[in-house]
UniProtKB/Swiss-Prot annotation:
This is Pre-core protein X. It comes from Human adenovirus C serotype 2. InterPro entries: Adenovirus_late_L2_mu_core. Residues 18-45 are annotated as: Disordered. Keywords: DNA-binding, Host nucleus, Late protein, Virion. Interacts with the core-capsid bridging protein; this interaction bridges the virus core to the capsid. The keyword Magnesium does not apply. Belongs to the adenoviridae core protein X family. The keyword Calcium does not apply.
Amino acid sequence: MALTCRLRFPVPGFRGRMHRRRGMAGHGLTGGMRRAHHRRRRASHRRMRGGILPLLIPLIAAAIGAVPGIASVALQAQRH
């Protein structure tokens, strides 16, 4: 039986998910696309300010989640 546990950690500099606005009123299609591309570039730069910790959190969570599975396989191998 698998048990999943979710933990929340405050990460300085991380503001959550960015919501994309649909429809640029008063702008042409190409103008809206240029602005959206420019915003994405800024958002990726903003994410890097938090350092390497936001990149490590999903890896640590995956490793913690894999521990029960690894332990059960080890126990089964030990029994056989």
